[in-house]
Amino acid sequence: MGRNTDNFTVVALNRCDKKSCFAIGIRIARAGVARWCFHPRWKRKVFIRFSARDMAQNGKIGVSTENIFPIIKKFLYSDHEIFLRELVANAVDATQKLRTLAKAGDFAGEAGDETIEIRLDREAKTLTISDKGIGMTAEEVEKYINQIALSGATSFLDKYKDAGAIIGHFGLGFYSAFMVSDEVEIDTLSWQEGAKPVRWSCKGDPEYTLAEGSRATRGTDVVLHISADNAEFLEKHRIQELLQKYCRFMAVPIAFGKKTTWKDGKEVETDEPNIVNDVAPIWTRKPAELKAEDYEKFYHALYPMAEEPLFHIHLNVDYPFNLTGVLYFPRLKSNFDIQRNKIQLYCNQVFVTDSVEGIVPEYLTLLHGVIDSPDIPLNVSRSYLQSDQRVKQIAGYITKKVADRLTELFKADRAQYEAKWDDLKLFITYGMVTDEKFYERSSEFALLKNVDGKYFTFTEYRELVQGEQTDKAGDVVYLYTTDPEGQWSYVEAARAKGYDVLLMDGQLDAHLLGHLEQKLEKTRFMRVDANTVERLIDKGDAAAVSLSEEAQGVLREVVEGAARGEERVSVRFEELGETALPAIVTRNEFMRRMHDMQAMSPTNPMFGSMPQSIDVVLNSSHPLVKRMWKEAEAGLSGEIKSSEAILKPLEEELQAINERTKGVEYDKVPAEDKKRREELYEAIDAAKKERRDKFAEYGKNNVLVGQVIDLALLSNNMLKGEALQRFVERSVAIVVGAQQK
């Protein structure tokens, strides 16, 4: 019926109004499939089919792609291994498309074995990814390989170059093969009836060859001729490693080599294909189908060296987004930095990355497990994800599920929940200080623990302490310790007053305290060594200091000079009673907390670079402090009188000038008064410095002063090294001296 003309066979004639359909038909027919198209000379619609001899052609991939191959080879050098994921994912996609065609009734053939094969030939230096999917016609090779796949790769590289952070480098697709290959071949046969096999090849430049192939069965082989620079990908163990990393949960069976067994004392191959993946991991199954052992087994498959998890959450939602997964609560250790990057992100069972920052809330990165969602955009930068509405919805859903699970566990068995609290605390604290929605839910399951090992919700604890621990301003003061052993004397002093003391020794507790002070009404947190026990909760009933102003001034300079070291020291006086210690060391709550927080933010040295400061509180009612004054008064009487004789006239003259110029604008103050005032300031400062130095020297050489200061430091666990050794030697000398008397 047909006739040959213009290198194609006219099978039938018909009318067609669209002149462009002829050119389209020519391209389609070259694929080996008959199609109607318009012939412009005959002004008729013709049904044509090219013969196999007409399929052979050489071509150029694209005039704008001269530089894409060197970019692919070099720009992503550190990520060459992703090529295997991209190619195997394509094979899986081709296989799943055949399933879809079969379900729709478009494919009536026998699907047969769907297994994707990975074949390694070290002698030929080739790696082959072979599938039994839908295959391609020549026209489809032209469309998907030379146009769509190329366009996708170019777009990917442009985005990667600009953003520098494409999630998992996901989406480079077929052209990732050229990262590791000198030449890539495609041998394919389409599922369509009457289709011809096609062979496409390219040597890493814009030129390609398209010809009739020899494949006799449906599907596609992608053959990579591995370059010398990438010889590692000809090693069996390396390919096994990549399949385990990227393909272990893909939805179509993947075979790499044969299973092995031990026979006659050596490992030999069997005839059974070595399937490297689990096509139905637990997150793709319904929770009702699974047992606790299934979740435990899966966890240890992901993290072979990890301890048993505390519990898990099974995620499964299909509206308004698709998300599945299983998240586990691990037993978190003190250093949470090493706990990150344990959540694996998948897209339709294809591994993308284990760095999920920007995809889930930051605190959730401490969890372990898998999340799988085709709705998370992967070919964008992480910074873009922060504003993506779908990602926000997914993050909100996961946060809600986590909070729901914690609430459920707390209400179901509080005793068991409390037993797990120490392992949960770091995660929950991190969530409370970094995620507002999680904090809002935390009142349902967050706990406070005191030094007696008892647990309280926030509401319970406030009811416990507000009666005794409310200060004169009406603030409820929560007392806490970060080191019950090192701060033992302070803890016991607080307990003796009837106060309760919380244990806040977590890595993030310094951050949590500030956060809670903002959230909880009229609430302050004070560490037990932040002040004397009488002033930790200031009720306005402190006793007046019995020492004279002169005595306080002298002892302040003596003790500050003697205690001066790497830390700034200030001295004050309180009436603590004769049975209390002669001196205690306290640390300003705000400054000490800032230093603690600095340990978590070493890149911001604002407070970390400032010297630590301590307050030495001298108990003015203690006999030893009174004795210190008497000794100082006697030992420094000459210096005191001399200093007073020098300072008094200077200070009186300065006071007279200040009185005389009070209220006078600076520009109108007589020049001689300005000059004399500056001279007096300098003279007074010099006299005071000379006095301080003498008083400091006295304090450093006075046994009683040194012993009282060191006892205070020792009670706060601050006496170490050489200073501790001096204290021990001095104590021994005091005991020996007392015995000799």
Residue ranges and their predicted role:
Residues I48-L234, E241, R248, T261-D264, ...:
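GHKL (Bergerat-fold) ATPase N-terminal catalytic module, capturing the glycine-rich phosphate-binding loop
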Residues I166, V184-E207, S227-A231, H237-K741:
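GHKL/Bergerat-fold ATPase module in large chromosome/replication-associated machines
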